[in-house]
């Protein structure tokens, strides 16, 4: 075995753990013919940690939004930075656009409905992913759920438990050859480390937990995993072209950026993004 290949096999698992980079490596199609060289190659797909999966981004405005759109954001504050570090992601918060310039979210103040303007003001970067087959009735049901639990508390206990879970779950990325193994591994760790609250007993939510429950209540679950296991980054990775830790029930579509954020602006300045 030549040295480059040996080094690659030796350091790849360590690299994946330290970088928390989830990878899917698919075997070649056994039914492909020998002349089908492209089908015979291994397909390697890396998890995208940035807010966009391609090199270029699309800037949008409020009229481009639809009820039920997911608003992913980050800020320049210490809390946002800490969440992004532990989740190895570019996002720290997720909310739902309800229409009529209203946004439903769970923050330290609890579950609340605020204006889109306020949500944008508190964010450095804000981009939108969409559930492509969401019906108007399901969007209405999401709004009804948000109004029903409005002013509920914030799930601080869930957040405290989530911090060590975000660290230990990175071990599940060490086997890039099995998507099923990764999902079973993460689910197993979640069952062992995170508390489980009965549906009727829930009195508080954190942001991604609220979003996951809202879609489930509307009859359009984003994932069948328990809502208390899901982080903003997990929802972001359920988009088309990405690699998700939990199996998505539907793949989210990138709509665009309402606010590019300081890092994307800097990337544009030096020519890294368009």
From Swiss-Prot:
This is Probable lipoprotein peptidase YaeF. One of its GO terms (molecular function) is cysteine-type peptidase activity. The gene is yaeF. A lipid is attached at residue 21 (S-diacylglycerol cysteine). It is a lipid-anchor. A lipid is attached at residue 21 (N-palmitoyl cysteine). The keyword Transferase does not apply. Residues 1-20 form the signal peptide. Pfam families: Peptidase_C92. Its EC number is 3.4.-.-. One of its GO terms (cellular component) is plasma membrane. It is an enzyme of class 3 (hydrolase). The active site is at 207 (nucleophile), 257 (proton acceptor). InterPro entries: Papain-like_cys_pep_sf, Peptidase_C92. It is found in: Cell inner membrane.
């Amino acid at each position: 075995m030549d040295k480059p290949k040996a080094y690659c096999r030796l350091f790849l698992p360590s690299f994946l753990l330290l970088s928390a980079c989830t990878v899917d490596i698919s075997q070649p199609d056994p039914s492909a013919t020998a002349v089908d060289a492209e089908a015979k190659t291994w397909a390697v797909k890396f998890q995208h940690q940035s807010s966009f999966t391609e090199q270029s981004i699309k800037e949008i405005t409020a009229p481009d939004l639809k009820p039920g759109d997911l608003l992913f954001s980050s800020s320049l504050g210490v809390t946002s930075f800490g969440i992004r570090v532990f989740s190895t992601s570019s996002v720290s918060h997720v909310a739902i656009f309800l229409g009529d310039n209203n946004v439903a979210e769970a923050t330290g103040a609890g579950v609340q409905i605020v204006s889109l303007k306020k949500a944008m003001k508190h964010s450095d970067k804000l981009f939108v992913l969409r559930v492509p087959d969401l019906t108007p009735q399901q969007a209405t049901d999401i709004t009804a759920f948000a109004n029903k639990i409005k002013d509920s508390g914030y799930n601080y206990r869930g957040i405290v438990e989530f911090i060590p879970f975000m660290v230990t779950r990175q071990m599940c990325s060490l086997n890039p050859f099995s998507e099923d193994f990764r999902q079973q591994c993460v689910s197993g760790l979640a069952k062992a480390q995170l508390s489980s609250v009965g549906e009727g007993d829930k009195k508080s939510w954190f942001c991604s937990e609220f979003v996951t429950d809202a879609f489930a209540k509307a009859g359009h679950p984003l994932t069948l995993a328990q809502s208390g296991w899901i982080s903003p980054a997990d929802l972001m990775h359920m988009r088309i072209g990405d690699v998700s830790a939990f199996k998505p029930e539907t793949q989210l579509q990138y709509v665009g950026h309402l606010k590019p954020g300081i890092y994307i602006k800097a990337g544009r300045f030096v020519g890294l993004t368009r």
